[in-house]
């Protein structure tokens, strides 16, 4: 919004008096020669911004008419050009999907072969298949339990290391009066060592 100026008979410029929202009037203010109001001051642009604004969108020598058919020929709803990374990710997803389908197809063909072998072969293979299914299912909980044990072992080792550091600091005289918590930590050392041994034997 431009500031309304009023010029008097002597040629002096004034900012016209305006009414405030509460109904009172602001006085008109004299403006010095060459004054530019804040809202009319152009925004500063460094040389790089100016360069990129002045830079044409098309390469030199290429007319805008030549580019119009290319943009029009692109199908509506067509995907924009993908970056190299996006293309690579799409290929990976596609490959994974194909491998998964391939694996499912192979498993299906194996089960069909077992079924088509005949009645005599089918009877003993049925318990084997039922035995194989629980072992495959039990592998996952085993691996989860193993990782859980590994985490516990790591945590216990860390606690033992802290207890040892605390004991060394007390022996070196860095801590003259250990707090109640620190004494409890030292007392728990044997229990931590036993728990760690049990877990390591369980693995």
Swiss-Prot record:
Amino acid composition bias (Low complexity), ranges on this chain: 121-140
Superkingdom of origin organism: Eukaryota
GO CC terms of this entry: cytoplasm; exon-exon junction complex; nucleolus; nucleoplasm
Residue numbers spanned by region Required for interaction with MAGOH and RBM8A: 1-32
Biased composition (Basic residues): 85-96
Annotated positions of the Phosphothreonine modification: 71
GO biological process: exon-exon junction complex disassembly; nuclear-transcribed mRNA catabolic process, nonsense-mediated decay; positive regulation of translation
Compositionally biased spans, kind Basic and acidic residues: 97-113
Coiled-coil stretches noted in the UniProt entry, renumbered to this chain: 81-116, 144-203
UniProt GO molecular function: ribosome binding; RNA binding
InterPro entries in the cross-refs: PYM1, WIBG_mago-bd, WIBG_N_sf
Region (eIF2A-like): 151-203
Main location: cytoplasm
Domain characteristics, as noted in the entry: The eIF2A-like region shares sequence similarity with eIF2A and mediates the interaction with the 40S ribosomal subunit and the 48S preinitiation complex.
Family: Belongs to the pym family.
Subunit-structure text: Interacts (via N-terminus) with MAGOH and RBM8A; the interaction is direct. Associates (eIF2A-like region) with the 40S ribosomal subunit and the 48S preinitiation complex.
Function: Key regulator of the exon junction complex (EJC), a multiprotein complex that associates immediately upstream of the exon-exon junction on mRNAs and serves as a positional landmark for the intron exon structure of genes and directs post-transcriptional processes in the cytoplasm such as mRNA export, nonsense-mediated mRNA decay (NMD) or translation. Acts as an EJC disassembly factor, allowing translation-dependent EJC removal and recycling by disrupting mature EJC from spliced mRNAs.
The protein, known as: Partner of Y14 and mago
